[in-house]
Structures are given as C-alpha cells and as structure tokens.
Amino acid sequence: DKTVFQVASCNDKDFQNLMHVYLDAVFYPNIYKEEKIFKQEGWHYHLDSVDGPLTYNGVVFNEMKGVFSSPEQLIERKIQQSLYPDTGYGFESGGDPVDIPNLTYGDYLDFHSKYYHPSNSYIYLYGDMDMEEKLTWIDEKYLSHFEYLKVDSEIKPQKAFDNPAEEDDYYSLAEGDSEKDKSYISYNAVTGNSLDRDLYIAFQVLNYVLIQGVGAPVKQALVDAGIGSEIISFFEESICQPFFSIIAKNTEVSKKEEFVKIIREELEKLVKEGINKDSLNAGLNALEFRYREADFGSYPKGLMYGLQMFDSWLYDSEKPFIHISANDTFKRLREKMEDGYFESLIQTYLLDNTHRSIVTAAPKTGLTAEQDRAEAEKCRKYFDTLSQEEKENLVRETEELTRYQEEPTPKEDLEKIPLLSREDIGKKALPFSNIEKDVKGTKVLHHDYFTNGIYYIDLYFDIKPLLAEYAPYISLLTSLIGCVDTDAHDKLAFSNEILQNAGDFTFDTLLSRKYKQPKEYKAFMIFRAKVFEEKTEKVFELLDEALKTSHLEDEKRLKEIVSENASALYMRLISAGHSTAVNRALSYGSRMGKYDEAMNGISYYRFLKQLNDHFDEYKENTIVILKMLMQEIFTKDKMMAGITCAKDAYDGFEKAFVKFAEKMPEKPEEDGNIQPQISFDDMHQNEGFKTAGQVQYVARSGNFVERGVPYHGSYRVVRAMLSYGFLWNEVRVKGGAYGVMCGFPSSGDGYFVSYRDPKLAETN
C-alpha cells in the first residue's frame, strides 16, 4: 500500500546530496523521456532474428520469477488474496510474471503520474539537522514546483466475510523430489485495524505465546499430532487491517481438517483455562526490551522509526506516533492481562471471527517446466501473428535497446550528480574501545560504551579442535541449548524464565580468519545475552542451568528440533540463493570455508536431512556426541568473555561473571573421541544445484591474498565501482538479473555472485 524511498547519512552534505538525487528521481524520473527504461527495468519482447525465437526479458520480470518460485512467498501471497480479495492487498505489488507483459508503457506512466505526485507523498526527516532549513529547501527545490492534485489513495478496508474463505493452490517442486509431506496449510484471521494501539502489540505477544515460544501450546499440539515438520506463524501489523497466520510446513493437504480442529480446540482451551501468565509476561518483556533498546542492527534507527510510523500515519494523518510511543501501551497491557484481555482477543479474532481463511499449497512436480512451456507458447503464438515488417521492427527495437544499454552515460549527465570533496569527509575514525583484562585466569574484553543500562555479553568457547569430526553436530547443539527441558524447568518454563530476564539468550558459531593470514583462523561457539544490569546474575544462573542440566537425551524433542531446522534451513538456502552459492564456492578453498559451510550451508542441510530421515538409526550416536560436546566445549580453559557497557557499570558484570566462572569445570572430565555415524566429506568443485526456481544464482570465488595480492582498503572502492559499473551493466542491465554483487574482504575471500538471474553460462 506504499512505496518508500529512503536515504540516510552521517554526513550533512552527503545527506543533502542524497535528498537531491532521490527527490529528483522520484518526482522527475526519466521514464517520461525514454521508453527504453521501461523495457529494460520492466519488460520487453526480445528478438535477435526474424526467424525467432521471441522471448520476454526485463529486470523486474525476472525478479518476480524468483519471487514466485518460493513456496513460502506463494502461501503468504495466497493468504492475503484470500483475506482481502476486494482491496489492493489481494494483488502482488511486484507483479505476477504471467501478467507483467500485459502492462503497457502508457498505463505505467498514467499510474505513476497519478500516485507518485507530491500531493500524495509523506515526507519524514529524522536526525540532528536544521529541520526548518531542510524543509524550506525541499519546498523551494521541489514541492513548490507542483500544483496540488487531489488523489484518492485512501486504503479501503475489506468488508468482513459472512463465512470463512478457503483457497488451494500449487507450487513447483524440482524434478526427482518426492511430493510426500511437502504441502503447506495455513489458518488466517484478520485482527481489527492498525490504529488500535493495544491490539498492535497484543497480537505480537500472542504470536509468541501461541506459536513462536519454545513449547508454545498451539504449536506443541500440532507437532505432537504429526501435523507438519515445522509450525510457524506471523503477525502482519504494517497494513490497514492486520492479520495473524498459523502455518504448517511439510505436511499433507489431507490433514487440513485435523489441523484446523487442533488449533481451535487448543485456542478454546486457552480461553477457558486461561493463558499461562509467565508466557504472557515473557512475551511482553521481550517486546518491551526491544522497544526500549531500539537496536535495529545494521539499519539506521531513524529509518526504522519512520517505517513504523507508516503503520498508523498512512491510515490516519493525525496519528503518526501512536506505535513509536508505546510506554503507556505496555503498562496498559500488563493491567489488562489480569482481566482476561488476551483470552478475549483469541475468542473474538481467532475463534468467533468469520473474516478468516484456510489456505493450502501443494507441490506439483514439473510445474516450473509447465510454466516455462506456457510462456514460450504464448510468445510463439504472438510471434506467429506478426507480419514480416513487425518482426523486423522488433529485431530493430531489440538492437536499439542493446545499444542503449551499452552506451556510456554522457559526461554532462555524470557531472550533474552532486559529489563530496575529500575535505567534506571526516578523517577521524569513530573511537574503538577494546580493553583486555585478566579476570581470575579468563581473558575478558571490555568495550567501554554507553549502553543505557544494558549489558551486552558474549562468551566465546574455542571449538577449532573439534571441527574436523563434529562441525555439523556443533551447529545442531546451538539449536538445542535453551530449547530443551532442564532439571529444574520444562522447556516452556525455561523459555519464559529467559525472556523475563533477558533480551537475548542465544548460541551461535563464529569462524574468523586472522588478519593477513588467510590460512590461520579461530573458531568459537558463542553465547550472547542482552540483559539489564540488575538481572545479570540471574541470567548467568540460567546459563549455568542450561549448560549443566539440559536434557539432550530427550529423543522426542531432538527429533522435533532436527525436523524444524531441516525445514527452515532448506527454505533459507533456496530463498537466499546468492548467499548459498557464495558460501558453497568459498568452501572449496580452505578448511575454514569447509567447516563454515558444514555448519550453515548445503552440507549442514544434508546432515540434518540424513539424521531426520534415519533418526532411529542415528539418534543414540547423535545424543552421545552432543553430550560429549557439552563437556568438551563449555570449560573454563576454552572460554573468553566480551562485555559492552560503560566503564562505571563494568564492576557489576565482573562480579556476576566471576561467580559463574568459578562453577565452570576447568577442563573436560574425560577425553571425548566418539566416531560420528554421519560424516561430511570434501565437496567437489564447480557444482550446480537444481531447484524448482525459474532463475539462477551464479557465484565465483577465490582467495586473492593466497595468490600474493595483499588486502588494501581501496578494494572497498573497487567493490563499489564493479558492483555499480561493469557488473551492473553486464549482468543486470544487459543480462536481466535483478542484482549482482562482489566482495573483497581483508581475509582475501573474494567473490562475485548474481541474484535472480535468468542467465547461467553467460553470467559465469
């Protein structure tokens, strides 16, 4: 329901330049002057010879083929179509590849001129700047040059249904894959409107309580009944009428009635008996921690605040801040929790509500080939209707487009782009704090930064000696700790304890090369926690409980986690095909690359699939190895700590850490040397992996440091020049790929990769 163009910079002149470039691109695009832009970026007929064949090509056309190749994208798209058939939400914003060739250049310009007009825009500024000066500049340079245009862009709500809807569809499965247990089933409900402040957060809490939390009751009931290998859910709050979905993956459509029956029975039970208050508190605490912390990772905080504002501003111009000012909302929800508020939401929106749907997506082997044939036949039929002159015109237009794409941008146009001078760029780097301490024999790295009362704790445990035999088992172990029963808590209670005391409590692996020594690397399992200072000791107590008393021998729970991880990893590998290809290519060149891939990539997926498919055969050996790894890894002699907090807060961390470390075993009780039944072998170089997708991801890699080319900071400039110069023109502009990337990090692991690419051999 919106298109967002965003810029951010820490440099005021750069920010001003970017505003100029973006506002010019949005309000004065060259699409009105040059139809070839539409052909290149949207779609066009491609004809090299009057003898054929005629094909479609275009960047967005190929991008959307990639989008439509994902079964999860399909089910999400069908959910919205089922719930909002009479509104814009019932359509694919990027366009269906089957329908994109029906879009004419004229219709495209009409749509743009109507909706992409200043009268229909929302402009948002955030940061340390002279707001009056910026707003005056925007008005004088852009807004004042347009006459007011009355635009009816109101988001009309979907009228509620008299009866729930049902929709069934198919997605493509790769040739040779079994269709057994590969279907999706979803239970979906519209949940009020986005201007209800309490609902907005309450359903995010219910998302955790019902499905996403470890041992969540609805999810557990579905898992226990064998409905799917993975149960997921999401709450889409960023549209006019939010909706909540529960999805079973890797199931059978024949289980649809049982799926719905179990969900409704569990929801009715929760309404009747009441929701676990610890679970509600855990969900509220987790959301409130994230809200107060306001850490958006690599995304600028101001950008994320702006995007959240649109969750209300777009639907009521007088309410832009209702969701980014939420202290009162959290307070209200804690009070309402005691009065059955969350139970009433379940009854109203998930049980009694008729504005809901059941959607299924079943696999169909060969559907991609069927779609490709239909597309080719459509092009052939159109080609057969053309006269000789029309064919010659298409050949000429194809040649003209190619020449247009190959022509360098005129110098006078390049000189219009506002640039920074060297004097505009500050030479002073941001300060880096890395204070090394020895705390009773353990190395501690203190990063002295203001963190607003939060400790960011990292514990590093050396795993390098274990990788050769146990790499995939180590990765599996990171998914188990904190997600299984302990001596003192079942998995649900333990998960609630974590979220009531910490903002983060996770395990992961990290492999890192030594600077300028590409063959040398370190490998760690990392425990990460975010915690308010006053709860640090409690979090260390929970960590001690998890490391020493986790019930890894619970075969049922182990099978659940293996199955869930295999399903989730498969989709991640497919949807992020560019990352999958790069990591696989890098695995050929070094032991570190091989082990990293064995813990995160295709090799790890194959390990999980083999363990899942033959669980009874491998479970005992796997459990023995996991227990051995717990003893081998989590010892004092393998531990290093990192803490990020202000200097005056450090002592509180050290006090709690020392108490925890004193209870850690110095070394493993006994040498672990258990032969794994599932091994991972060296990979063959130059591989191809077949999927049901209609586009490719093509990668090449190699280590330039090992070949005698030392790393230099200028390679960051080279990366930008290649990505937006040669590679952009050859792979995206001419080739039709949606994206192309490259990287030259200090480790020397260089790579090139395309994204949603219709070509393979040409790109390679």
What name fits each language-model region?
Residues D1-Y28, E35-L47, Q73-V98, N120-Y126, ...:
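M16 family metallopeptidases and their MPP-like homologs
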Residues Y45-N120, Y124-E175, E179-D181, S186:
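Hydrophobic, small-residue-rich alpha-helical packing segments that form membrane-like cores
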Residues N57, G106-K141, D596, N600-G601, ...:
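Non-catalytic, conformational "gating/processing" segments within enzyme and secreted inhibitor domains
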Residues F61-Q73, V151-G215, P300-K319, H323, ...:
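His/Glu-based metal-binding/catalytic segments typifying zinc-dependent metallopeptidases
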Residues D110, Y122, M131-D152, E273, ...:
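Extended, regular secondary-structure scaffolds
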Residues D110-H112, S172-G176, I231-E236, L445-H447, ...:
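Short beta-strand/turn micro-motifs at beta-sheet edges
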Residues I346-Y349:
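Core subunits and conserved enzymes of cellular information-processing
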